[in-house]
UniProtKB/Swiss-Prot annotation:
Keyword Phosphoprotein belongs to the record: no
Cofactor: Ni(2+)
Summary of the function given for this chain in its UniProt record: Transcriptional regulator.
PANTHER family per the UniProt record, alphabetical: NICKEL-RESPONSIVE REGULATOR
Binding sites annotated in the UniProt record for Ni(2+): H76, H87, H89, C95
Coiled coil: none
Protein name: Putative nickel-responsive regulator
Keywords: DNA-binding, Metal-binding, Nickel, Transcription, Transcription regulation
CDD domains xrefs: RHH_NikR_HicB-like
Cofactor: how and how many bound: Binds 1 nickel ion per subunit.
Pfam families: NikR_C, RHH_1
Stated family: Belongs to the transcriptional regulatory CopG/NikR family.
């Protein structure tokens, strides 16, 4: 086992301590090891290739200079991946967006990484599910009745 020293800002330390208390960890090292494992698993899941559908969820401060314009440009640049977006005003400055994506897993991850890296984006997560690509010329001859 290796001993590592890290520096955390006060806000992040408070959040970490809250997780430790809520989950009953014996010490910070146990919590950080678990969080590192989760991050490693998530990174492995993000490296999935092939076609998938996904949900990109993020919050951002719309008052940050040029951020709404930059986000709009990114969405126009990746218009082939985005199917629908829901936008919610959380308060005077913070917004939440949920975007449904459809395409190659690597392209979806690249798009999400680009959005999440923008200054003013506070939180971001991409959830992907492997899916078959839509059939060319798919005709809609089946019912969507839940009772079928």
């Amino acid at each position: 086992m290796h001993r590592v020293t890290i520096t955390l800002d006060d806000d992040l330390m408070e959040k970490l301590d809250a997780i430790i208390a809520a989950r009953g960890y014996q010490n910070r090292s146990e919590a950080i090891r678990d969080l590192a494992r989760i991050g490693i698993q998530q990174t492995a899941a993000e490296t999935t290739s092939g076609h998938c559908v996904g949900a990109m969820v993020y919050t951002y401060d719309h008052s940050k200079r040029d951020l709404p314009r930059k986000l709009t440009q990114s969405f126009h640049h990746h218009h082939d991946l985005s199917r629908a977006t829901m936008h919610v005003h959380l308060d005077h400055d913070q917004c939440l967006e949920v975007t449904i994506l459809d395409g190659n897993a690597t392209e979806l991850q690249h798009f999400a990484d680009h959005i999440f890296a923008e200054r003013g984006v506070r939180y971001g997560r991409l959830v992907t599910i492997p899916a078959e690509p839509p059939a060319e010329g798919h005709e809609h001859h089946h019912e969507h009745d839940a009772s079928s």
